[in-house]
Every structure is written in structure tokens, then in C-alpha cells.
């Protein structure tokens, strides 16, 4: 099991949909979150993409020297990036980071944003372009280890004599992650990517997605890993966790929700449509209405695009829900919480000890200093002495 955290390059806050409790984004703050994730033992961090965010490649590059082992899940954008350039970017980053790059293939689902970026393709065409893009990208990087070149002619993208002089550290290329809920997305995932990501839907729906992608991949003689993107609200007691879930959306105004849902409705993303359906397009507001599956809460999606659900509960309950997803075949959990700095610590301290040993192994590199405040100037506390 791998647990990732999230770098909030679109801003951070204690409340959703309001400036109250907001935290200004700065490089110092981004570094704090990254250093915390690195030192706490998270496998890596997802760095978001889109016009609401700082550029993910610039941000990720700036975090290489302040982290030691943290991996960076960074987006490539067909239509915004050309595959040859994206291959050079990936190879350079991978070498300079010591092999810590992971690629997030993002097709995009907001037509207004895409058109602003110069991409005028419909849903089907975007997935065709993405399939061509990642095929070219993979081939260029794979051939770079032997000095090879690539000729490729597609419907949307073509290259002639494409060559990468300096290969990536990881062979054949940094692993490719990809998310999407449409049939076209599942086809692309099955044929070309290393790990398929889903947003946090109820376990039964996630199981259907996994089964579909797995079956499609088998037809190509491939296997695919699976990951899930979730928010987390974990506290020492169940009541505290649900109170903080309510508090997170307590400053939301009706007009803010209406405006956000109208924007989501204009998108042609199947994943976003499925997220919106979980809270009935913003009409559900109470805990009973927003708890769409045991301890799975859809309140975040009232105003946040993309991942809109959170696991809510005490540490043991949240760990149990994570294990339920793991039993379905999920091995990568990309998590976040508001505010991201404090919640990175809280989740690691409360939930990591309850997860498989492979997660805790990343914490074993301590320097032998105090673990907790020394008791009576005599000894450091241990779990057995609590």
C-alpha cells in the first residue's frame, strides 16, 4: 500500500467556499507541506493542474532540493504539451530528482478552460489525442535508453525522427497514472498506463470500475495497478470528525454552491458528472444526505471540482474503510485534508500505525532523537507506556 498526500497549489483554508480561514499560497507554505509529507513517510505528493493552480512542473521542480525521498505525481496535458517536449521535461526531472517522478496523464474535462488553452476538441477527440500523446511519449522515452528514434503518424499527433538524447533514470520511463470514468478513459487506461486512478466513489462503484479496466487490460495481455483520490477528516473520535466535516462547509452560502454546480454542469467530464450526482447537484446538505456510503461524505464536492468526497471518522474507522478499498484492489491512496499542513500530520500520526507495515517502514529512517516529549527527564514514551 502506498499513501500519497497533496500539495494545495490552488490555495488552502479551514473552510470551503469562503475567504474566512483562508491561507495565502506562498512558496514557503508549499515547502512546509512537502517537507512534512517527506518526513512523515508519505510515498509521494500529487501536484494539481489547471488554471486555478500554480504550474505543477515549476512547483515540483522547486521542491526537489528540499525533500529527500518524496515522489512527485506531475501532470502532462495533451493539447497543451507536445509529447516530445513532455518527454524531455520528464527525463530531466527524473534525472535531477534521483528518479522521483511519476506522470499524471490529464485529458481535461472543462471545455471552457480547454478552449482558453487553445484546445477545441470534443470528448472523444480528446481521448484519441491523449492515446496518441502517451504512446509517442512512452516510445520516445523507452527508445532513449538505446539511442533510438521514433516516427509516428496519427490522427491528431505526428513526429518524425523524434529522439531523446538524455534518458530518464527510471526504466523504461517514469510510471504513468491516469484517471477517467468514461468508456474511452477505461480503454486508454487498459491499453497504455501503469496505474488507473478513480475519485472516491462508494466501494461498489469503485469495484465496477476496477473490474472493467482489469478485464480490458487482460485483453491486451496487460495488468494495471489501481489508486483512489480521497479527502480525509480523521479525529480521535467519530463525533469530532463529523463535527469538523460540518464545520468545513459551515460558511458556504447557497449562491456559492449554485454557482459552483452550474460550472460543473457545463463540463463534459463523466467523472465530474458522477461526483455531482453523489450530492444531487448540490441539493443535499445534511450529514444524513451527504454520507453516501458508511463514512464516505460528499460535502467537499459542493464547491470543489474533481475529487469531492472524504473519509470521515476516528482513526480505526478510517483505516478500516481504507482497507476495504484495498481489498478491492486499490494499492495507492492519494489523500488530502483541510488545512493540508496540519492534516498531513494528523493523518500520519493517527492512521499510519493502523495501516500495513509497508507504510510505516518509510518512517524507520529516524536519527535516534526523542519520540514525543521525554517523561520526567527519564525516558521517551513508548506505545506500551501510554
Curated annotation (Swiss-Prot):
One of its GO terms (biological process) is alkanesulfonate catabolic process. Pfam families: Bac_luciferase. It comes from the Bacteria. It catalyses: an alkanesulfonate + FMNH2 + O2 = an aldehyde + FMN + sulfite + H2O + 2 H(+). The keyword Flavoprotein applies. Keywords: Flavoprotein, FMN, Monooxygenase, Oxidoreductase. InterPro entries: Alkanesulphonate_mOase_FMN-dep (IPR019911), Luciferase-like_dom (IPR011251), Luciferase-like_sf (IPR036661), SsuD_RutA_monooxygenase (IPR050172). Gene3D superfamilies: Luciferase-like domain. Its EC number is 1.14.14.5. The keyword Transcription does not apply. One of its GO terms (molecular function) is alkanesulfonate monooxygenase activity. Catalyzes the desulfonation of aliphatic sulfonates. Belongs to the SsuD family. This is Alkanesulfonate monooxygenase.
Amino acid at each position: 500500500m502506498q499513501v500519497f498526500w497533496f500539495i494545495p497549489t490552488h490555495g488552502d483554508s479551514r473552510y470551503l467556499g469562503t475567504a474566512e480561514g483562508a491561507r495565502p499560497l506562498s512558496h514557503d507554505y508549499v515547502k512546509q507541506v512537502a517537507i512534512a509529507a517527506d518526513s512523515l513517510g508519505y510515498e509521494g505528493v500529487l501536484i494539481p493542474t489547471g488554471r486555478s493552480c500554480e504550474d505543477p512542473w515549476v512547483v515540483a521542480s522547486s521542491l526537489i532540493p528540499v525533500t529527500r525521498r518524496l515522489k512527485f505525481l506531475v501532470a502532462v496535458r495533451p493539447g497543451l504539451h507536445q509529447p516530445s517536449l513532455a518527454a524531455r521535461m520528464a527525463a530531466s526531472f527524473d534525472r535531477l530528482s534521483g528518479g522521483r517522478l511519476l506522470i499524471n496523464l490529464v485529458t481535461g474535462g472543462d471545455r471552457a478552460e480547454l478552449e482558453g488553452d487553445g484546445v477545441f476538441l470534443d470528448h472523444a477527440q480528446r481521448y484519441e489525442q491523449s492515446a496518441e500523446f502517451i504512446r509517442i511519449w512512452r516510445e520516445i522515452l523507452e527508445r532513449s535508453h538505446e539511442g533510438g528514434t521514433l516516427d509516428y503518424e496519427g490522427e491528431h499527433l505526428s513526429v518524425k525522427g523524434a529522439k531523446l538524447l538524455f534518458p530518464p533514470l527510471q526504466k523504461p520511463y517514469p510510471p504513468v497514472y491516469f484517471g477517467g470514468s468514461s468508456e474511452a478513459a477505461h480503454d486508454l487506461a487498459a491499453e497504455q498506463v501503469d496505474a488507473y486512478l478513480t475519485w472516491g466513489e462508494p466501494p461498489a462503484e469503485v469495484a465496477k470500475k476496477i473490474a472493467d479496466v482489469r478485464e480490458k487490460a487482460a485483453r491486451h495481455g496487460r495488468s494495471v495497478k489501481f489508486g483512489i483520490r480521497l479527502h480525509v477528516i480523521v479525529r480521535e473520535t467519530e463525533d469530532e470528525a463529523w463535527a469538523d466535516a460540518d464545520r468545513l462547509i459551515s460558511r458556504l452560502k447557497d449562491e456559492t454552491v449554485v454557482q459552483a454546480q452550474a460550472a460543473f454542469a457545463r463540463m463534459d467530464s463523466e467523472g465530474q458528472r458522477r461526483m455531482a450526482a453523489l450530492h444531487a447537484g448540490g441539493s443535499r446538505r445534511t450529514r444524513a444526505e451527504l454520507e453516501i456510503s458508511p463514512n464516505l461524505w460528499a460535502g467537499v464536492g459542493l464547491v470543489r471540482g474533481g475529487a469531492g468526497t472524504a473519509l470521515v471518522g476516528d482513526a480505526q474507522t478510517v483505516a478500516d474503510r481504507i482497507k476495504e478499498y484495498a481489498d478491492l484492489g486499490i494499492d495507492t491512496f492519494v489523500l488530502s485534508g483541510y488545512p493540508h499542513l496540519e492534516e498531513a500530520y494528523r493523518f500520519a500520526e493517527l492512521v499510519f500505525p493502523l495501516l500495513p507495515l509497508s507504510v510505516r517502514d518509510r518512517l524507520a529512517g529516524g536519527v535516534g532523537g526523542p519520540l514525543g516529549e521525554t517523561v520526567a527527564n527519564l525516558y521517551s514514551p513508548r506505545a506500551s507506556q501510554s
